[in-house]
């Protein structure tokens, strides 16, 4: 493993965490929503966040950053730009105009589907999937399956926040996906 795949410095991780707002009982009672808006609004905290990801992946010999709909679309293109890589959007069903491949995944009540264009990548391309948060892990696992179906190598899943009590990070690791998260929160 190269030095680019080292952990985030504790002080930077704490700094990032201090810029994430917790909104109690939203979108429903009992949920502690982790709002990254303050992190994005302050130029310094956004720069620290992107620099952490750049430091991690600068020597990883990647071809693309893939971002999960929707907040992965905020961080992913910035990171791709900084690393001089392309960006692959992994969209909710029905949002992509060209030929696409789809993968459904389970939600607490029902299922959802994500899609990518069938020409999004080619066999052997090395990709990191990024999102703001890992909760149940379903969306990121579906993205991994889609990219691997096209022959890509998913090097790692990355997120700003891990909510380990929801089991997503465990599910993803057990499914063979290496993970990197900047910070974590207890609870939902």
Swiss-Prot record:
InterPro entries: Ade_phspho_trans, PRibTrfase_dom, PRTase-like, UPRTase/APRTase. Pfam families: Pribosyltran. It catalyses: AMP + diphosphate = 5-phospho-alpha-D-ribose 1-diphosphate + adenine. Its main location: cytoplasm. One of its GO terms (cellular component) is cytoplasm. Gene3D superfamilies: 3.40.50.2020. It comes from the Bacteria. It is found in: Cytoplasm. Its EC number is 2.4.2.7. Pathway: Purine metabolism; AMP biosynthesis via salvage pathway; AMP from adenine: step 1/1. It is an enzyme of class 2 (transferase). One of its GO terms (molecular function) is AMP binding. Belongs to the purine/pyrimidine phosphoribosyltransferase family. Catalyzes a salvage reaction resulting in the formation of AMP, that is energically less costly than de novo synthesis. Homodimer. This is Adenine phosphoribosyltransferase. It comes from Paraburkholderia phytofirmans (strain DSM 17436 / LMG 22146 / PsJN) (Burkholderia phytofirmans).
């Amino acid at each position: 493993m190269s030095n680019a795949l080292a952990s985030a410095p504790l002080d930077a991780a704490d700094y990032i965490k201090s810029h994430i707002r917790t909104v109690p009982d939203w979108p429903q009672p009992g949920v502690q929503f982790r709002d990254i808006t303050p992190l994005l609004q302050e130029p310094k905290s956004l720069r620290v966040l992107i620099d952490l990801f750049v430091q991690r992946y600068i020597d990883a010999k990647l071809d693309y950053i893939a971002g999960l709909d929707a907040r992965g679309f905020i961080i992913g293109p910035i990171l791709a730009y900084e690393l001089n890589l392309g960006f692959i959007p992994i969209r909710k069903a029905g949002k992509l105009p060209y030929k696409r491949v789809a993968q459904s995944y389970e939600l607490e009540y029902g299922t959802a589907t994500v899609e990518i264009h069938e020409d999004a990548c080619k066999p052997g391309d090395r990709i990191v999937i990024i999102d703001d948060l890992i909760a149940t892990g379903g969306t990121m696992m579906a993205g991994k399956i889609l990219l691997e179906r096209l022959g890509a190598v998913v090097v790692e899943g990355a997120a700003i926040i891990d909510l380990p009590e929801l089991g997503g990070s465990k599910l993803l690791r057990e499914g063979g996906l290496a993970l990197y998260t900047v910070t974590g929160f207890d609870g939902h």
